[in-house]
Design a protein with these regions (language model features):
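Gly/Ser/Thr-rich phosphate-binding loop
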Residues: 244-248, 257-319, 332
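Conserved AMP-binding/adenylate-forming
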Residues: 46-90, 199, 396, 435
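Conserved pre-ATP/AMP-binding loop-to-beta segment of ANL
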Residues: 3, 18-19, 134-157, 164, ...
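Conserved AMP-binding A3 loop
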Residues: 33-35, 153-180, 309
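AMP-binding/adenylate-forming catalytic core of the ANL superfamily
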Residues: 345, 372-459, 476
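Conserved structural elements of the adenylate-forming
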Residues: 37-44, 149, 168-189, 197, ...
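Conserved AMP-binding/adenylation subdomain of ANL enzymes
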Residues: 176-193, 203-245, 259
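Conserved ATP/PPi-binding loop(s) of AMP-dependent carboxylate-activating enzymes
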Residues: 326-330, 336-364, 395-397
Length: 489
């Protein structure tokens, strides 16, 4: 896509749909047309300019989902600034570590009572206080002609096997290209209404549920982030707003199967044409089949990494069981001798903030994914992981980060953290430990309380197992495969 076409795509989408609805905000019962939304974007842009925010500045966002946060992404593109996106549900230590990787102009938070030990925090609601002298017209869309698609746009965070959060850098061009390539498989349009219930601090919330719908000229129903308390009334807002396009996570699917005891979702799916997309983690075939049978809703699994964006997807009339689908156009894949997936995509990330790219790419410029897989009839099958990560509820979690934290508490003699397959969350976190103490019930409660406070709820240990000794390799390292086998006996 040439520069002129890129520059016009924002302007064209807004202009062609100026008086049509774009976002239905279920959080605040506020429905915005493209015109209303553009007014909000310009309002936030002007308020940031009043605070001396200028080109190439960084803003750190520690924010929950809101329609104003969505507008901030568009305002940031116009201002040519970079957004550092951090999940506010992470623990205080994790947030502090991420927020100090790069100096920011402001650190935006939702509530003055949030205590992240970060200076220069600003309450986000101050940024979108309405300017009374705004006179927006369709001609103001010319502002989009000056967008810079190549400069650094977002930094999101992923957990590496070392336990140190890595800042994944992307430009606006990557969001555009990946969205358009993915949409070639589905042909989304203004008839599609996406249900947005993933956090806007991760790629799933930004790419899958913001820019993919926008560049597809689709509508968005914005809701709070999904959690287990939302299961019983999961279908209420989708039914009310006639949602017909979902991005499910495997955790959502398994929890709906277990806890959704009503007929609202079943009847809705049976009587409406719905696209069910699945991402963020591998989907077990058992869960897929059970969900499709219960709701009469076809699920299309895809493969997408924070670093590469969309790689593959199943789609209508091209859906192979136990596979994540054919490669998208212009995506290249290779494999090492032990089946590790190597990737080259048109929307490859710019690198990790502050780190050299050398250890993450091979000599041919392919990204070393850490996942294992193979191609069958041009469809990618994921076989497992090479890197030491736990995926719990779609969240990448470093076992080493938890091990180091527990060791620092000096309660156990030895510690090993493993991810064990679990039906609802994908994997559960199991702590194997040794100790000469016989009763550590209070200490175990203390460990989990500290983990939730400092690292975040997703890091909470699901099961503690005491052993006399932890098995070791000949080199003296803890033998995690042996531990996993012992657990499964």
């Amino acid at each position: 896509m040439d520069l002129k076409t890129k520059s016009n795509i924002f302007q064209k989408i807004f202009a062609e749909n100026w008086d049509e609805y774009f976002i239905f905000d279920t959080i605040n019962s506020n429905n915005l047309t493209y015109k209303n939304f553009f007014e909000l974007v310009i309002n936030i842009k002007k308020n940031l300019e009043k605070r001396k925010v200028k080109e190439d500045d960084y803003l750190c966002l520690i924010l929950n989902n809101s329609i104003e946060l969505i507008a901030l992404f568009f305002a940031a593109a116009l201002l040519k600034i970079t957004l550092i996106c951090i999940d506010p549900s992470r623990g205080s230590d994790e947030i502090l570590k991420m927020s100090t990787i790069q100096k920011s102009k402001f650190y935006l938070i939702d509530d003055k009572h949030q205590n992240f030990d970060i200076p220069e925090t600003e309450i986000f609601s101050n940024i979108f206080q309405k300017n009374t002298n705004l006179n927006i017209s369709i001609s103001d869309l010319d502002l989009f002609n000056d967008l810079n698609y190549e400069r650094l746009f977002t930094i999101t965070f992923t957990s590496g096997s070392t336990g140190i959060p890595k800042g994944v850098m992307h430009n606006l061009n990557n969001y555009l290209k990946s969205s358009l390539l993915f949409n070639k498989r589905f042909n989304f349009s203004k008839n599609n209404i996406f249900y947005h219930n993933l956090p806007l601090s991760y790629i799933g919330g930004i790419l899958n549920l913001l820019f993919l719908p926008f560049f597809s000229k689709s509508k968005i129903v914005l809701d709070e982030q999904f959690n287990i308390s939302k299961v019983s009334n999961f279908w209420n807002n989708p039914v009310q707003y006639s949602v017909n396009t979902f991005w499910f996570t495997p955790t959502e699917l398994s929890l709906l199967l277990k806890l959704d005891r009503g007929n609202l979702g079943i009847e809705y799916c049976k009587n409406k044409t719905i696209v069910g997309l699945v991402g963020t983690a591998s989907l077990r075939e058992e869960i897929k089949n059970n969900f499709e049978n219960k709701y009469d809703l076809k699920l299309f699994e895809s493969y997408c990494l924070s670093e590469t964006f969309f790689v593959t997807t199943n789609y209508l009339n091209n859906d192979q069981a136990n596979h994540t689908g054919p490669l998208l156009d212009d995506v290249k894949v290779s494999f090492t001798s032990d089946n590790e997936i190597l990737l080259n995509t048109p929307s490859m990330f710019l690198g990790y903030l502050g780190l050299s790219n050398d250890e993450f790419f091979n000599n041919n410029g392919f990204y070393i994914s850490g996942d294992l897989g193979k191609l069958n009839n041009n469809s990618l099958q994921i076989l497992g992981r090479k890197k030491d990560l736990i995926i719990k509820g779609g969240m990448n979690i470093s076992p080493k980060r938890i091990e180091d934290f527990i060791i620092g508490l000096k309660i156990f003699d030895e510690v090993a953290i493993l991810g064990i397959e679990e039906y609802y969350m994908g994997e559960k976190i199991v702590c194997f430990y040794t100790s000469e103490e016989s009763n550590l019930n209070n200490e175990i409660k203390l460990i989990n309380n500290q983990i939730v406070q400092k690292l975040g709820l997703y890091f909470k240990i699901d099961e503690f197992i005491k052993l006399k000794i932890l098995p070791k390799t000949p080199s003296g390292k803890i033998n995690k495969p042996a531990l996993k086998s012992k657990y499964n006996e």
